[in-house]
Amino acid sequence: TERLFAKMRTLRDQGAAIFIVTHRIAELVRISDRATVMRDGVDVGVLAGDEITEKNLLGLMTGDKKFSTASEIKATPPNSISDEIVLSAKDLKVWDNGDFINFDLPKGEILGVTGLDGQGQDNFVKALAGIDQPLSGEVIVKQSDEERERTKKDYTTVNSLLDAKKSGVGYVSGDRKKEGIFPNMSIYENMVIPLYKGKQAKTSGGFIGFIKWMELNGIFDWEVERLSIKTGPKNNLITSLSGGNQQKVMIARAFTTTPKILILNDPARGIDVGAKRDLYKHLRIFVNEGGT
């Protein structure tokens, strides 16, 4: 990045004009002499010189003049964190040369894991969600009431995505193109597909399950509104949406299953700053209502 910026500055000093389109605010602050902000297809303001700050850009991008910068935002304290353990990792190992991982996740906590790309966090998260098998160890999840009644056990070992789903675990991938969206299906189908039940029938209107359409429509409309998803006609292909709105649909899909535990792998990838703030707010609401 630094080499690119240095080359751009050299070209500018030689008289070249450079036009950059980006949602990466830090890049604009570091490289731009003038910045125009667009919101919903409208030019909402132009900044120049010392006016190009993170706070000013965020204010124009979100329409909120009091918008706080990322460095000023602090996590909202949880209402309560229970002593009840809902997920545990026991001697979990996801890399040959990695350490064993042991931890307990109490109900009502938001646990963050970070690291540079390619340092094992993707393998770790997928092992927790039952997508990939760890090299050793196990992931234990408290079962849903339905599964506990059926198996007579409070906890179960997660060996697959189906095991996780039965125990009320929802997952959102950070790679929507490879692991998230169904590109040949509509926006609507992409969001509510986990709710389809029973034998499916193919018609000109798409896949129809045995859940009442009224209920599905209500769920779809609710998630669109609360996550501020700009969808257009819901029967349009998911690929008609911007990357950020595709990501929101994936997050909404996880919420439609009313999970007890949400595992999110880089959930804010490709989402604008205002939507990130809304997402984090909804995650806090989720845990305050009993989720983890």
Language model features: what each stretch is:
Residues T1-T292:
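Glycine-rich phosphate-binding loops of nucleotide-dependent enzymes
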